[in-house]
Amino acid sequence: MADSYDLTAIRNIGIMAHIDAGKTTTTERILFYSGRVHKMGEVDKGTATMDWMSQEQERGITITSAATACKWKGYFVNIIDTPGHVDFTVEVERSLRVLDGSIGIFCAVAGVQPQSETVWRQADRYHVPRIAYINKMDRVGADFFRVIEMIRKNLSSDAVAIQLPIGVEEAFSGIIDLIDFKAYIYEDESGEQYQERELNPDERSKAQEFRNLLLERLAEYDDSILEKYLEAREISPAEIRSSLRKSCISNQIVPVLCGSSFKNKGVQMLLDAVVSYLPSPLDIPAIEAMDIASGENVRIKPEVDAPLCALAFKLASDPYVGKLTYFRIYSGRIKAGSTLFNSRQDRKERFTRLLKMHANHREEIEEACAGDIVAGVGLKNTATGDTLCSENHLVLLETIDFPQPVIDVAIEAKTRADQERIEESLRRLAEEDPTFQTRQDKESGQMIISGMGELHLEIIIDRLLKEFKVNANIGKPQVAYKESVKKRTAAEVKFDRQAGGRGQYAHVVLEVLPLAEGQGKRFADKSSPEAIPREFIPAVEMGVREALQAGILGGYPVDDVEVVLKGGSYHEVDSNEPAFKIAASMALKEALENAQSVFLEPVMDLEIICPEEYLGDVISDLNARRGRIIALEENRDTKAVKGLVPLAETFGYATSLRSLTQGRASFSMKIKNFAEVPESKSREIIARRYGLPV
């Protein structure tokens, strides 16, 4: 058993893949073989330990990342099982931010799929070392070697087999270990027992070929391996493992394994690879933070006796303990009941309880240390991306960035009592999920909820109705348009109200500038303290930001703009914060009137897999939807169409594609960017928005 304070024996890993590649089934087998659970859960029966939400059990998919931990051969493994559906990519993003390594799971039939690419790029961004596991080797059409080629080509990764399958499809019966040069045959259904044997002549020939490929790849990065390889000297399994570990941790090589998690084959060897090749907290570069006192960047080393530094990466509601805050400890230690400092919020927080999570089950602990991932109860003001640290050593970690929502749904309470419950429920859900947002429509007064896709909002609404017991009328999904500007413009407003007694006075001059796509909203103060005292600047910014929530074309949020406060004036007696907030809001509205406002719409990356005989119809339909073809790729029996299409044109696409291809095509899509809406479509949006004839 590993001591949780022995950092060399800790592995913090994530499990990531496209939907239906077998992530949760693999996690269930890991928990069973490690002794963490005593019965295997099954996704299709709704009994998976990690899919504990009712919405996950009903749909057979993972919706929220679930944390657990197990022990394997003296190592302590923290595991986060992440969703594979594009609507829940935020769960992958925030998990990878705090993990040291990951397992990328690929279906042996489908290979690299669209969401496989998305999560792989996310792991690239955070420099997370990973191993690849080609699952479902028992399925008809399984091709281990084809999937390795896809990983190399589509993911630009140096994928190298360290195992070979024995048999394929129904004949898949075991695994060849290229490092130990042994065969392992599974004989019982549970997979708990497997027999080791020597390789037969045919297996030996194939294994030698791939072992040489492995050694050649290692020799590129390891001089000691290169020297022995060139001199034809024997290289021991221990030397290969040591070299492979270094190459994996430095993201030079991705070791590739195989198995069938559902048929209980290959999972124990996958666990061996996790502890052998993925890093401990000591093996990865120390994380950077800003020292608040000096303003300089410092490196936070994973030391138990150092000052505390931790990152809150996930919030969740628990029916028994209330708000749970998940966090990764980078240095120091935390005790239950201790007080710490939230440096982003600039306030103290106190833990009442510390918990080790196993999906939705809680294990109370007294202390947690550097390298660990735990949950805390009692943090009232901490949000996702906040830094928790010692009060005598204030540091700030880089926060976590999340994509903007792309789809809206109107929601309306059935009674006044439900209205209050809706507002509180939505606040809690938005606290948990940074890609879920709420706002009130200025025109209709309706509450608008926004998310990453139809399934995302469907799950949110289901939770509102079932978990929070809210009675509400739900509208149809709508595109979450944004507004922006194309022209630089300025406006000047004097707000002067005198109505007996003390008046209100504020004078502001604002300039509005367009920004490139994805730059968000910026506010800059270039006024002089003599024109506007510094204490009124936050009120000006607040007025600007509130006014940006509703543009002048259709009342949609304004984005990709910079608003600059150029100047103004004040009155020593009559000026106050509310006056400057009102003046700033009025000036911004006036500036937007002259800034050539436009609509921005979400554009989706679309990939369609279809038989060749339907290709013409699929492309014609895509063109009619304002789509643009980017690439056509050959698969074994199908064509892959990759393109861009506005989200507004994709509602009901699943039904249309089924009709066009007699149900023989599939598609997936994810947000690419926001782009300007053509003028003809803009007129349609305005007409629909205000109930005018289109």
Swiss-Prot record:
InterPro entries for the chain: EFG_II, EFG_III, EFG_III/V, EFG_IV, EFG_V, EFG_V-like, EFTu-like_2, G_TR_CS
UniProt binding sites for GTP: 17-24, 81-85, 135-138
GO molecular function: GTP binding; GTPase activity; translation elongation factor activity
Gene3D superfamilies for the chain: 3.30.230.10, 3.30.70.240, Elongation Factor G (Translational Gtpase), domain 3, P-loop containing nucleotide triphosphate hydrolases, Translation factors
Main location group: cytoplasm
Domain tr-type G intervals: 8-282
GO CC, any one term: cytoplasm
Segments traversing the membrane: none
Subcellular location: Cytoplasm
Listed CDD domains: EF-G, EFG_III, EFG_mtEFG1_IV, EFG_mtEFG_C, EFG_mtEFG_II
SUPFAM superfamilies per the UniProt record, alphabetical: EF-G C-terminal domain-like (SSF54980), P-loop containing nucleoside triphosphate hydrolases (SSF52540), Ribosomal protein S5 domain 2-like (SSF54211), Translation proteins (SSF50447)
Keywords assigned by UniProt, alphabetized: Cytoplasm, Elongation factor, GTP-binding, Nucleotide-binding, Protein biosynthesis
GO terms (BP aspect): ribosome disassembly
Family to which the UniProt record says this protein belongs: Belongs to the TRAFAC class translation factor GTPase superfamily. Classic translation factor GTPase family. EF-G/EF-2 subfamily.
Its biological purpose: Catalyzes the GTP-dependent ribosomal translocation step during translation elongation. During this step, the ribosome changes from the pre-translocational (PRE) to the post-translocational (POST) state as the newly formed A-site-bound peptidyl-tRNA and P-site-bound deacylated tRNA move to the P and E sites, respectively. Catalyzes the coordinated movement of the two tRNA molecules, the mRNA and conformational changes in the ribosome.
Name of this protein: Elongation factor G 2
Species of the source: Syntrophomonas wolfei subsp. wolfei (strain DSM 2245B / Goettingen)
Lineage: Bacteria, Bacillati, Bacillota, Clostridia, Eubacteriales
